[in-house]
Amino acid sequence: MIASLVGSEMCIRDSLQDNLPAFDHKIALKIIEEELGSPANELFEEFPDSPIASASLGQVYKAKINNSYLAVKVQRPNLYFLIRRDVVILRFLGTFLSPLLPLNIGVGIGEIIDEFGKALFDEIDYQKEAENALRFANLFKENPNIFIPKLEKQFSSKRVITTSWIDGVKLRDRSLLEENNLIPASFIKTCVISGLQQLFEFGYFHADPHPGNMFALKGGNADCGNLAYVDFGMMDTITNSDRLTLIKAIVHIINEEYYLLAEDFQKLGFLTKEQDLQKLVEPLKEVLGGSLGAEVGNFNLKNVTDKFSKLMYSYPFRVPSRFALIIRAVVSQEGLALRLDPEFKILKIAYPYIAKKLLTDNSEEILEILLEVVFDKKGQIQIEKVE
């Protein structure tokens, strides 16, 4: 159910990525002139007669100026009205059907629909997207494996956004990467590490990391490939408190401390304050017990998510609306990784990253979490965890 709560929006959006027919080229030219003040043929040295890609919210042209190629994204007409109409309809249906659905989630589906609706309205404001792109680029300026297209402010407005052109390979399938002499595993690692940085270091993350928004670039190495992010319309934040609690939850899963894990869920808002946490210890143990196998790296997020979804039908878990986009981003990113490598295990990459953060972060909260990793309940050093 975790995935299904965001799944309908994801399926609709992802099915439209790069698949919708282009809207009338004359309309696109009209929008460019209205937004930028001059016709496209006066603004750019070259401007094509048709877009190179067309998706749910707009279409992209490959233009040229000063011997450099640019990506000019033009918004579909009437999007504000169409999104408002669809969100109102979905909100009504969600509110009406919520009591009839066999979902014991403790929070109205309408709140989650509202969260996605807000994100969609933000996504069609290209001025906000431009600000997001600049902020995201600044966060990754010290990371040599992450590339963000340069914003061209003079050719950007509320319905048109222009950036430098990214010449890369979309992370759609393994064979496509291999045909271009690119190593899939290296891009999975860069993708996962950058996602972890966004959630646990920056507190600001790309909420739409589907294959069409991520490009594999030449360079890098067999360990970490060079990766470009595009499309910064759907972004979100996570508080420091939530970040720390999520790290604690991961540690409690690894240590098989299910009562403490239930407390983490309660603090994050997935369980009400009135909930008797002791009753959840055995169900959590059934779902998560043995999920790590012989090694931490064997943890299979998809299998656990599927089991947890069934658990949520029987116990009073809920999905706080502020986690809707976080879940969407994590599910999208794992789906992308599994597309490139069906045997992908997220903790093989995530656990060393989290361990490094625990060892290098000097905050008091992180130190407390580190002690939980190093010592068991009896105060003995957990050699296998430390190693």
Annotate each PLM feature.
Residues 69-75:
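Glycine-rich ATP phosphate-binding loop
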Residues 19-30, 34-66:
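ATP-binding glycine-rich phosphate-binding loop
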Residues 208-210:
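Conserved catalytic-loop position in the HRD/HxD motif
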Residues 157, 166-168, 174-190, 217-387:
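Helix-rich C-lobe and terminal helical cap/extension of kinase-like folds
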Residues 1-7, 11-12:
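Single conserved hydrophobic/aromatic residue that forms the stacking wall/gate
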Residues 49-55, 152-156, 324-325:
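A short beta-turn/loop motif at secondary-structure boundaries
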Residues 12-21, 33, 80-85, 95-206, ...:
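ATP-dependent phospho-/nucleotidyl transfer catalytic cores
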Residues 212-216:
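Hydrophobic residue at the +6 position relative to the catalytic HRD Asp in the kinase catalytic loop
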